[in-house]
C-alpha cells in the first residue's frame, strides 16, 4: 500500500517503483572471490554499502558491478553511499562485463544525462589492481565519484592494451587523484556524453 496517491505522470509498463523501506545496508569484508564466470559482487541498494578488505581473483566479468536496472532483471535502483576500500583485484574482467572493467557502475538507463545521474557518492579508495591492461573503472550516470590512493599494476597483454584505464559516461563531480599507476599501464581516460 502507498501512503499517498500515485503520481499521475507514472506510466504503466514504462515506469518502475521500488519499495525502499525493504532495502538493506550491506557490508562485505574479509572475503575471497575467485574464478567466477560472472561478476564477483553485484551490488544495488540505496542504503550504505561497504566493500572492504576483500580479494577478487580472476572473476570472469567485473569484480564489482553496481547496476540499477529497470530494463531487464528489475534489480534495485540507484546507489547513494558506496565505499570500496582496501581490496585487491587480480586478473578480473577477462571475459566480459561492461567495457571489461574491473569495477563497473552500469545502470540500465537509456538516456544518459550528467545533470540527472542515477548513482551518487561512490568512493573507491586505497585498493590494489593487478590487471592485464583492461579498464579499472567504467562509470555511467554517476555523480560524486572518487577514485583515489589506489595502486594500479598492468601486465603486458596485447588483448586490452588499447583500452583506457578509466571510462566515464555521463558522470559529474568525478575526482581521480593520488593514484599510483605503473608505467606499463595506458593512462588514458575516455569521456562520453
Residue spans for each PLM region:
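Small/polar beta-strand repeat architecture
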Residues: 1-30, 34-35
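Non-cytosolic beta-sheet module surface loops
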Residues: 4, 55, 128, 139-141
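Short, recurring structural edge motifs at helix starts
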Residues: 14-17, 38-40, 70-75, 106-114, ...
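Parallel beta-helix/beta-solenoid
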Residues: 23, 28, 36, 41, ...
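Short glycine/acidic-rich loop motifs that flank beta-strands on beta-rich extracellular proteins
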Residues: 37-44, 60-67, 89, 93-101, ...
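Active/binding-pocket-proximal capping segment
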Residues: 46, 56-62, 67-71, 81, ...
